[in-house]
Swiss-Prot record:
It comes from the Bacteria. GO terms for molecular function: large ribosomal subunit rRNA binding; structural constituent of ribosome. Part of the ribosomal stalk of the 50S ribosomal subunit. The N-terminus interacts with L11 and the large rRNA to form the base of the stalk. The C-terminus forms an elongated spine to which L12 dimers bind in a sequential fashion forming a multimeric L10(L12)X complex. This is Large ribosomal subunit protein uL10. Gene3D superfamilies: 3.30.70.1730, 6.10.250.290. It comes from Methylorubrum populi (strain ATCC BAA-705 / NCIMB 13946 / BJ001). Belongs to the universal ribosomal protein uL10 family. Keywords: Ribonucleoprotein, Ribosomal protein, RNA-binding, rRNA-binding. The lineage of its organism: Bacteria, Pseudomonadati, Pseudomonadota, Alphaproteobacteria, Hyphomicrobiales. Forms part of the ribosomal stalk, playing a central role in the interaction of the ribosome with GTP-bound translation factors. One of its GO terms (biological process) is translation. One of its GO terms (cellular component) is large ribosomal subunit.
């Protein structure tokens, strides 16, 4: 890799570190190519990305970013998983690590907050942004439907009363 390619990679990684909500660092020693492809496809489905980069270049790219706290984790064969959704990358990495013991989560960062492996696992248990949005919409819509039911209930009762009077008059 020549100097310009390295500079391009550093600027790309710097952009990744500044624009994404969460970065997870893990060791991948012993993962097969098939396992890595499976991890990449699962990340892609969740809206996250996995990148393997030289630790030295990733360390340079971390300078001046909010997630610079992950620098000490960049030792050995490390991969970086990141996403704009604060939960997606952590959730996929933790789920994959449960089924494949070769992927060892070292930690990560969410904004300026450094996360240890337990912090990443705790982050993975939280609902995603889409799930939270769906719950919020449901909570907002629930009172509106209840109001509509309450408003319509007296009208329905009135209609039944008038219907009963009409039947009574017809019978008489």
């Amino acid at each position: 890799m020549d100097r310009t390619a390295k500079a391009d990679l550093v600027s790309t990684l710097n952009g990744v570190f500044t624009t994404n909500a969460v970065v997870v660092v893990a060791h991948y020693k012993g993962l097969t190519v098939a396992d890595m492809q499976k991890l990449r496809s699962q990340m892609k489905q969740a809206g996250a990305t996995v990148k393997v980069a030289k630790n030295r270049l990733a360390s340079i790219a971390l300078d001046g970013t909010d997630v610079a706290s992950i620098k000490p984790l960049l030792k050995g064969p490390t991969l970086l998983a990141y996403s704009s959704d604060p939960v997606a990358a952590a959730k996929v990495a933790v789920d994959f690590a449960k089924t494949n013991d070769k992927l060892v989560i070292l930690g990560g960062a969410m904004g300026t907050t450094a996360l240890n492996p337990d912090g990443v696992k705790a982050l993975a248990t939280l609902p995603s942004l889409d799930e939270l949005r769906a719950k919020l919409v449901g909570l907002i819509q629930a009172p509106a439907t209840k109001v509509a039911q309450v408003v319509n209930a007296p009208a329905a009762k009135l209609a039944r009363v008038f219907g009963a009077y009409a039947k009574k008059d017809e019978a008489a």
